[in-house]
Amino acid sequence: VTSNADRICTGITSSNSPHVVKTATQGEVNVTGVIPLTTTPTKSHFANLKGTQTRGKLCPNCLNCTDMDVALGRPKCMGTIPSAKVSILHEVKPVTSGCFPIMHDRTKIRQLPNLLRGYENIRLSTRNVINAETAPGGPYTVGTSGSCPNVTNGKGFFETMAWAVPKNKNKTATNPLTVEVPYICTKGEDQITVWGFHSDDETLMVILYGDSKPQKFTSSANGVTTHYVSQIGGFPNQTEDEGLKQSGRIVVDYIVQKPGKTGTIVYQRGVLLPQKVWCASGRSKVIKGSLPLIGEADCLHEKYGGLNKSKPYYTGEHAKAIGNCPIWVKTPLKLANGTKYRPPAKLLKERGFFGAIAGFLEGGWEGMIAGWHGYTSHGAHGVAVAADLKSTQEAINKITKNLNSLSELEVKNLQRLSGAMDELHNEILELDEKVDDLRADTISSQIELAVLLSNEGIINSEDEHLLALERKLKKMLGPSAVEIGNGCFETKHKCNQTCLDRIAAGTFNAGEFSLPTFDSLNITAASLNDDGLDNHTILLYYSTAASSLAVTLMIAIFIVYMVSRDNVSCSICL
C-alpha cells in the first residue's frame, strides 16, 4: 500500500482558559468560558418597584405629618391614602403624633401605621361607628384640646376617637360600662377601630370625670381581649410635637374586626370612644426603606435599596427584599459556557508494535473559532480546522437548558419566600431574622449544589458530543477512510479545507475528493505466482510453519524456566 493520505480527526477547541468552575465530583475545572450567575450589589436609593404601585408615606399629600398622625386622624393630617401593592416602612425610629401626648409604650399603638401599610386599599369611613354623645354612661360632651389644633388652628382632636367627657350633672364615678362596636365597612374589608382613654392628676380627674381613682378598660375582638388600668398623675407637662403642653396623657389602642364581626369595649371614665374607622382590604408587601423614592427598580432590598436585576443570584449582605429580585447565595457562582480546557493536540509520529498509527494525543484544536466541536485534517496542505455548528448548538442548548433549570429553581425559591411574606402577621409583617437567615442558608446550599451538578453534566456531555461526531464522520467517510483510533481516520484521498468544510456542513461526497487531482491512494494488488501449488497447499505450509514455530518457542521457554529453578542442569563439552 502506498499513500499520501491525510488524517481527519474529531476534536474540541483549544484556547486560553482563564475561567474556573466548580463541579460536584471533579472539584475546580478549567473551562473555555463561563456565565457568571452572581453579582454583588452596591447601596442605592430606594425606588418605586417596576410595574407595581409603591407607597412611601401613607398620605403623600399630608404635609408635615407622620404616618402616625395619619393613622390616628390628626385634624391637620386628613387625606387620601393611595392604593399600593408595596409599602415602604420609612420611619426607622419611634414616631409620635403632633397632637395630644400619648403613652406609646402602654399598647401596641406604634404598630398601627405598619398595620395599615400592610393593606393594598385603605380608606377612612365617612360616618362614625358609635354616637359618642349618647353612649352608655352619658350624656357626654366630645372634648377637644388646644394641643391638637384643627385646620383653622382651633381646638380639635383625633378623627378616629371621641373624648367622652361627662356633662356637668353626670360627673360621677361609674361601674364598668359596655359598648358594642358594630362592623360598618364593606364586606370583604377588615375594620381597624381605634380607641383609648385619658388620665390626668387627681384634681383634673375629679373636675373632668368626678372620680380620681384609676379606671379600668377592656377591649375584645376576634377572640383577643386586652385589659388596661389608667395611671393617675405623675406626668410632666409636655406635648408630642406642637401645641399646648399637657399634664394629662392618653393611651391609644386598636382592634381589628374581620368582616361582619362585632367588637366590644368595656370602660369607665375618661374613655376615648371609636369614631371613624379604617376599612382596609388586599395585601401590600412591606419593606424597611427610606424616602424619597427615586425612579424605578426591579427589586427593593432593605440593605441595598433599589436594584435592577442583572443576574439570578447575588452575594453580599443578606436581607429581606421584594420584587423581581436575585436570590442571595453565600459564594459567587459560575456556569460552564464552553468546553473543558484541553492543551493543543499533537500528532503521534510513532507507529505501534503492529504498525498501526496511534492517532492524536488527547487535546484540543486551535483555530476552531466558529464552534466548540468539529474536525481537523493534517496533510501536505498543513492543518485545516472546521467547526461542527450543529454539535456546538446542541451543547449550547444543553447549557441553556441548565440555565433555565436554575432560573426555575430561583423562581420556586422566590415564590416560597414571597408566600412566607404573604402569611405574616397582620400587625408587623416581618419575618424573624434568625428564621429568615436559616431559610436563606438552606436555599443558598440548594442553589450551589444545583450549579455544581449542572457544571458536571455540561462537562461530562462533551464525550457524548465527540462520540456523536465520530459516528457522523465515520458514516460520511465510508470506505474512503480507515479508522485509526482516538476519533481519527486515515483517508484514501486528500482532504484540504474545502473537504473539511463540507464534512462539517454534512455535504461531503467521497467520490468528489477521490479524483486524481487529490492524489488518491495508489494500491497495487499482490499476486500469487503459479508454482504448481494450489491454495490449500499454500495454507497447509503456512499453518505447519506457524505451528512449528509456536512449539519451538514453548519448549525454549520451558527449558529456560526449569534452568532458572535449578531443576535442569546443562553441561557443554568441547
Curated annotation (Swiss-Prot):
- Per its record, how is this protein called by name? Hemagglutinin
Single GO BP term: endocytosis involved in viral entry into host cell
* Species in which this protein is naturally found: Influenza B virus (strain B/Maryland/1959)
Q: Where is this protein localized, as stated in its record?
A: Virion membrane; Host apical cell membrane
Which gene carries the instructions for this protein?
A: HA
Query: Keyword Lipoprotein on this protein?
Result: yes
| S-S bridge residues | C9-C488, C65-C77, C99-C148, C495-C499
Q: Which residues are glycosylated?
A: N30, N64, N150, N170, N237, N308, N337, N496, N522, N535
Where is the major localization of this protein? virion
Q: Cross-referenced Pfam families, in alphabetical order?
A: Hemagglutinin
The miscellaneous comment for this protein is: Major glycoprotein, comprises over 80% of the envelope proteins present in virus particle.
Q: How does it assemble?
A: Homotrimer of disulfide-linked HA1-HA2.
